[in-house]
């Protein structure tokens, strides 16, 4: 039986190359590289300890996370559509590739997989959001809060940009006096009675606007001057606070950062977002303007789509819910 026994593979021996005293720069560089390769081969011959194995896996995992953060911050991100506010342009359960480069790449905004927000810097982009663009953005927070309680990405259509005047009359949207048509796959029920409700819930507070009859309102542009008085300062209270300033009324004067003021100079550009499913969308009509700095990117295409409400324990139903007709569908 011994004649069939495999011979144990003998380990090769390696010796490091000595650097001659009179070697030039290129020779030294080549020898350094060869010695580095030899050291790697010697290292592979030695069996790893448990601690070394754990350290190797840790380095690989950390490296993968860093690569994901760089790609996610600079180029392409993934976004899962959580609600039907943009139906039928996108559907609940669509998984989207998002182009982040177009509006300006940024350093990572969250820790991957756990969604913990990070301080980030945004670089200049190819263009700013335009009317008609579908945008992914960091939710700026509810109407009456300075900062959102949790970090969330939202998806809406930009219907007006900085300096535009927007008005909704009987569900029809007008920008600078011209009707903004319902997008190709958008939804709206013109036969449904015009809704007088929720005038206390819309933005700005106290204006009495409704979902279906709204404005006119100017979308703030950097360096705009907003005139303030005792009647309207509440309308702009949280807008000004979100820009990082304190505003109060002492019974006589309006105070911004403790100093009397009758006007406020806008510090950023903003846009106005609405869902294509206009009757069933929580959007800028309710919580206000979207800072350009919050706009992350624009969706490119659907790379996967299924019912995200079904648990993985119901794998059969989950797989049967795959919408093959939506995969590889471009978004516009």
What would you call each of these model-derived segments?
Residues 2-53, 89-332:
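Soluble "head" domains of membrane/secretory-pathway proteins
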Residues 77-95:
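Alpha-helical transmembrane signal-anchor/signal-peptide segments
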Residues 56-75:
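Hydrophobic membrane-insertion alpha-helices, especially the h-region
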């Amino acid at each position: 039986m011994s004649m069939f026994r495999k011979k144990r593979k003998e380990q090769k021996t390696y010796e490091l190359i000595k650097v001659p005293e009179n070697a030039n720069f290129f020779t030294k560089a080549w020898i350094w590289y060869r010695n580095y390769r030899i050291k790697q081969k010697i290292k592979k011959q030695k069996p790893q300890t448990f601690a070394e194995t754990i350290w190797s896996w840790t380095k690989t995992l950390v490296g993968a996370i860093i690569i994901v953060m760089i790609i996610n911050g600079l180029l392409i991100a993934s976004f899962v559509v959580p609600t039907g506010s943009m139906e039928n342009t996108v559907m609940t359960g669509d998984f989207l590739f998002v182009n982040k480069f177009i509006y300006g790449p940024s350093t990572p905004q969250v820790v991957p997989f756990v969604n913990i927000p990070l301080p980030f810097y945004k670089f200049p982009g190819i263009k700013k959001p335009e009317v008609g663009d579908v945008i992914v953005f960091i939710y700026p927070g509810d109407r009456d809060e300075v900062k959102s309680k949790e970090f969330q990405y939202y998806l809406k259509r930009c219907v007006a940009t900085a300096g535009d005047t927007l008005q909704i009359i009987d569900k029809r949207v007008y920008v600078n006096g011209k009707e903004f048509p319902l997008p190709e796959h958008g939804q709206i029920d013109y036969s449904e009675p015009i809704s007088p409700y929720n005038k206390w819930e819309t933005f700005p507070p106290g204006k009495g606007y409704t979902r279906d009859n709204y404005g006119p309102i100017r979308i703030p542009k950097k360096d705009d001057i907003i005139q303030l008085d005792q009647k309207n300062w509440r309308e702009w209270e949280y807008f000004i606070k979100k820009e990082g300033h304190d505003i109060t009324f002492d019974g006589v004067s309006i105070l911004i950062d403790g100093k009397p003021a009758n006007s406020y100079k806008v510090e950023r550009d903003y846009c106005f977002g609405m869902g294509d499913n206009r009757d069933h969308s929580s959007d800028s009509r309710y919580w206000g303007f979207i800072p350009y700095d919050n706009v992350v990117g624009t969706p490119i295409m659907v790379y996967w789509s299924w019912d995200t409400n079904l648990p993985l324990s119901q794998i059969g139903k989950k797989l049967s819910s795959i919408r093959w007709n939506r995969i590889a569908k471009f978004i516009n």
